[in-house]
Amino acid sequence: DHGFCYPQGTTDRGGEFSHIPMLWLGGAIKQPLEVDKIMNHADLAATLLGQLELDHSMFPFSRNVLGSDYVYPTAFYSSGNYFTFRDSTGVSAYDIRANCVSYEEPADNGERLNRGKAILQSAYDDLSAR
């Protein structure tokens, strides 16, 4: 999932997101299931720890996608001078250097874009506090 987009033909600055399969095998899995939700790669930590019934509070950007409190599925990624945010309403991509929306589908009332900006700011705040 780093360095190239998958499946082939997917771009990292538009409405398409990488679909990265993940297989979990062994004791952490209580029963077979397929999870088809919008989620982020950072959610892996909280989800796995949740299955093991371990605390995941040290991962503030990770959510347990199998938990009952996972009610607002989202995906976010940033690279260089842009970020992309997806939720059930659609996807918004923002070019930070150009200070403009570079992709939006469907048109957004600004809420989706603001959520993406808030996540990016929170990540910067977290990094600067370390």
Where are these regions (language model features)?
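Solvent-exposed soluble domains appended to multi-pass membrane proteins
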Residues: 1-130
